[in-house]
Amino acid sequence: MAHARTTYFHNTVGGYHGAKPHRMQALYDYHLSKTISPNVVNMLNIKYTLQTAEDGSLTAGVNPSAFGNVWLVEEIISCSSADDEIQRLASEDLLRKALTTDNISQNQFALDSLSQISLVSHKANELKYRTTVSSTSFAVFSEMYYPHGWKSFINGEEVSHYRVNYALRGLLIPAGTHEILFRFEPDVIARGSRIRLAGYGIFSLIVLLFFVPLKRFGLKQ
């Protein structure tokens, strides 16, 4: 109940429900349950923590090292397996490097003082970012990777994104100034909408075919 109450007002790692996606649950169990990994806390952009004082009261602690909603990395490290990836989260410099088992065409990136990326709007089903980079870059987003519905777009054109750091999203960005959009558009919902629209069309056609002849018949009478 406490988790649900907190989640009503704030984004929380635990979420509002005990059931979590498999990788998020594994991440929680491996790095946030018994032993807390600062690296994982920071990449999940955990800005505040609740700490129990000696008298049993709760106090809020601020984490100044949180990475933010999104950041650019200099290197992508290829991991041999998901187990290798989740284990290395505790030791790698995740602010500069991203871990993955995906096949990404480029793994080294040059960053300069002009390269930047930031979140500009946030909705439950849509995230919008603005970025300016001098050369091809790679961004890590502090959002769960979920391929069954989340689609990514650069300047309105759909592009592929990747799973990095075991459970987060990553995206290759071409040089220049761009608008990046993540939108939740599950194919099953799109199919349902098309079927519903087709149903409306068929129903309308039946109405026309049934009532128009009746109207003409009435006029003849």
Predicted regions and their residues:
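Conserved luminal/periplasmic juxtamembrane motif of membrane-embedded glycan-processing enzymes
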Residues: 1-130, 136-143, 150
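Active-site-proximal, structured, solvent-exposed surfaces of multi-pass membrane proteins
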Residues: 47, 96-220
